[in-house]
Amino acid sequence: MIEIRDEAPQDFPAIRNLNVLAFGNPAEALLVDKLRAANKAAISRVAILDGRVVGHILFSPITVERAPARLHGLGLAPMSVLPEFQNRGIGSSLVRDGLEMGRQRGYDLVVVLGHLRFYPRFGFTRAKDHGLDNEYDALDNFMVIELKEGVLKAVTGLVKYAQEFQDLAI
């Protein structure tokens, strides 16, 4: 049975290795390390199976160009599952859990730059349809979900991820 919990310092090496294996390069692993070091890992959860870290999800703060000062938004990135455990529902469990953590912790919305066949099943819709743009010129695969009903009516403009994303050219 999968257990999902907040990351702990003893998980950091496994999370680093997991991201390298899942993405095939060290960029996302470096991003996680940099976000954590800058205290920008707002939500960072791990999936544990038989005592082993098999999945990880991280949410970091975002800003929206034209939004109320009180807006608390998150960017979902990265989310990874060890290759040998993919397509078993672990990623879906991490996303559902992470969104619920965001709601419980008072966040307003989450954006993701991700797979069109994966994220809509959780309620993500095309961000452009809500007047939101991104720094990466992504269109259809840049998506958003409200964690508080009606919040998207008050926001438009450019969504900016944490500076660490630009520093690593993710």
Language-model-detected regions and their locations in the chain:
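Terminal substrate-recognition subdomain of acyl/acetyltransferases
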Residues: L116, P120-I170
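Conserved acetyl-CoA binding element of GNAT-fold acetyltransferases
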Residues: A69-P83
